[in-house]
Amino acid sequence: MGSSTPSNELPALQEAFNFPDGPQSMLPATTFLIGFVLGPLFFAPLSEQYGRRPILISTLCLYIIFTMGTALSPNWAAFLIFRFLSGIFASPPMSVTGGSIADVFVDKVVRGRANMLWSSATLLGPLAGPVIAGYTYQYSWRWAFWASMAFSGICLIALVFQPETLATKILRDRAAKLNKEKGAERYIAPADMDKPGLLVTLKITTTRPLYLLCTEMLVALTCVYMAFVYAVFYMLLKIFPNIFHGIYGFTPGESGLAFVMMFAGSLISNVLGYFYDIYAQGLVRRHPNKHAEYLRLPLACVGGPAFVISLFWLGWTSRLSIHWIVPLLSMIPYGFGYQCIFMAMINYTADAYGIFASSALAALAACRSIAGAIIPLAVDSMIGTLGIAWSCSVLALISCALSLVPFGFIIWGEKIRAASNFSKKLQNAPHPDLELTRSVSIV
């Protein structure tokens, strides 16, 4: 929600801070997403070491503080600085939550459904931001940030009552409690045996996402695909005003209908995802020795073409001679395709990398945030040079090429993993769930 909130109140921000149209109009989203790049690289691996709950609560508190700073910004520079800091501390849920889901749900089918609901929320947030801003900007551009801050406060209250999910942290706390009760250091959690020093731990945990990105082809290709899909969303935040305001004369609030259509498409994908999970569960029972994570990918194989079609549809129907409902309806297959791609690729990555899911998801989050921050800066130049129709066509053609990624994983995924030293070690290691749920040991 925080990343896209300013997109529908740019006229009010330009009036308040007196900055020119063009690339600067994308800076509220860009600075936020740059923070999104940095956050997961540190917070996700640290959550694997020190627990999910402390990271989520502390960063959400700081996010609320910096969102308040954004709402109170006296000038353009302060606004952008607070947006950057907000982005850093808004990032942990994008990667840490995936790790929490992997902690709680051992069954891969149930975990897939939980990830489906979570990925729906990650789409609903960016969709809700412009809709809220479209109606609040007429009072003040600050109101959208007050609304975001209030919603975050509600989330913080709920988070306080959430228990820790990381098994190693639970065992560490249990050992500490027993030692306190006995008055002696008699108990130690398995994860603390031969535990490296703090600096070594930080080095390992903060470099692991980068290591996976550079050495794991599955992670790298998934990052490229999801990064481009994510960047297209932020490009549409700039393209929509050119279409619905520039061509059809919509108000910012009315332009929010496009985001409602996106959400309708995502709901359809969730229904499909639920019934596909039931089908996949049957396949797992019949073929228990197969890698179940590959059953996640067919959703992306369906979503990719829908995503491509929606961009062609939007670009070539956005003209005065065609009723506004036609380009608006293109956002239904867009939302469907976007959600299917994210559901499938996130679930596939989480299943494939097990206890290191947070690190792999952190690499995904960082790459898509970089793409979402940088690529949309070219939107104005692209539209000015190519026009709306051909701009959307270029995006559709690139998406078409990248939509082959999940098909490639289905065909060659096992060979790719067989050639990966990291995947070999992960598969040959003791089962992580058994290893992490042992009782504390007496020394």
Task: Give the location of each predicted region.
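Helix-breaking motifs and short loop linkers at transmembrane-helix boundaries and internal kinks
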Residues: F17-N18, F42, Y50-G51, L72-A78, ...
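Conserved MFS/SLC helix-loop-helix module at the cytosolic interface between two early adjacent transmembrane helices
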Residues: L38-A77
